[in-house]
Amino acid sequence: MERKTVLVIADLGGCPPHMFYKSAAEKYNLVSFIPRPFAITASHAALIEKYSVAVIKDKDYFKSLADFEHPDSIYWAHEDHNKPEEEVVEQIVKVAEMFGADAITTNNELFIAPMAKACERLGLRGAGVQAAENARDKNKMRDAFNKAGVKSIKNKRVTTLEDFRAALEEIGTPLILKPTYLASSIGVTLITDTETAEDEFNRVNDYLKSINVPKAVTFEAPFIAEEFLQGEYGDWYQTEGYSDYISIEGIMADGEYFPIAIHDKTPQIGFTETSHITPSILDEEAKKKIVEAAKKANEGLGLQNCATHTEIKLMKNREPGLIESAARFAGWNMIPNIKKVFGLDMAQLLLDVLCFGKDADLPDGLLDQEPYYVADCHLYPQHFKQNGQIPETAEDLVIEAIDIPDGLLKGDTEIVSFSAAAPGTSVDLTLFEAFNSIAAFELKGSNSQDVAESIRQIQQHAKLTAKYVLPV
């Protein structure tokens, strides 16, 4: 069979480049379009070059030789991308037509809506224009969820301080204030005290002005205020060590939801995730409830052909509470870990769906559990504050070393990989925690509880050597 051509809108996020490009290129010819060259790391650029038959970069972002250089790491691209949505759509269409693309995909949350519009114009399978907008704008998302037969929660659009005051009056506390257009829990804030609520709103609103997003990202209101979803851990798990929420990965094919795998989590720092354990140890009844909720949510958004990453709160009486869902792959190493544990290559499966619809080899339910577990974990400054190594008043630190002492792992759990910020790395402790991962590690073991306890031990006992900047 002749290899089909897939246009990849290359940017940050989703399935990591170290898996995506090799997996995709094994079956498809890849054309990579880079709308934000400044958002590509050196290793990402090398993989794009290695596995693409052609690479197109937006020429408007090359003003000097320095613009051809790529940094070693990026969490969030802070340079401006000032092209409106329609111009981005036209760029995608032009490149797709130039190479006769049979499908278009991206791993980046911020280009989901322009890509959907380009797919529609070209007659290619995609998420669907309205569905993509529903999945990108969290106000529209919550409206769709509330109509989809899942737990309905109070919510209100927020643009101004007056809107926030009205939301606070209507919803009460605890209340979640969430940016409608971002990802990675950036800016998500729990409001519990009415006395300080307005100060919190102003703080988050001011901070978000410093976070650049492409001009093509559109929304009706910058915030959504929602009632807090209260978890009930003991109704779902029979052992300690996990969190009261999970994520479930799936695929939409011609408007039908296909669940793939559920990830357990370890306790968060605020709303910042700390680790994902693949697969989940939840019992079959619990998994069935989660799958039913995810199906209603994603089909309720109207999604047609795309990957889905759905986050669900585990509430009282085993009621799933929809947090949000994205029309893209999960980030971190969750997609590679599904392949490690189950042998399913979701990167290839998505492209199969985009090219062939339901003729792709889709699973008929959650993948069966294999005899081992893989955990994808990060360490943040807050872990070292909690274990007393970073002074609570510190505003900055310069890392000298991060080490994991011997004797922390439980059962047959082993460290597969470990990486830490390089010596001399400066960390601004005033940033949202999600920006400040300072170490990452992967664990593997035959017992999920041993893996979870090993994570907890590492969080409590990892050794940080650093210099601190304290307020005068």
Swiss-Prot record:
The record marks 332 as: Plays a key role in restricting the N-terminal substrate specificity to small amino acids such as L-Ala. The keyword Transferase does not apply. Mg(2+) 2 binds at residues 311, 324. Optimum pH is 9.5. Changing residue 309 to R: Loss of ligase activity. It comes from the Bacteria. InterPro entries: ATP-dep_AA_Ligase (IPR052032), ATP-grasp (IPR011761), ATP_grasp_subdomain_1 (IPR013815). The keyword Nucleotide-binding applies. Residues 142-355 form the ATP-grasp domain. GO terms for biological process: antibiotic biosynthetic process. Induction: The compound guanosine 5'-diphosphate 3'-diphosphate (ppGpp) is essential for the transcription of the bacABCDE operon and GTP regulates the transcription of both this operon and ywfH via the CodY-mediated regulation system. Its EC number is 6.3.2.49. Its cofactor is Mg(2+). It holds the Pfam family ATP-grasp_4. Keywords: Antibiotic biosynthesis, ATP-binding, Ligase, Magnesium, Metal-binding, Nucleotide-binding. It catalyses: L-anticapsin + L-alanine + ATP = bacilysin + ADP + phosphate + H(+). ATP binds at residues 138, 178, 184-185, 226-229, 268. Changing residue 184 to A: Almost no effect on catalytic efficiency. Transmembrane segments: none annotated. Optimum temperature is 37 degrees Celsius. Substrate binds at residues 273, 309-311, 328-331. Monomer or homodimer. This is Alanine--anticapsin ligase. It comes from Bacillus subtilis (strain 168).
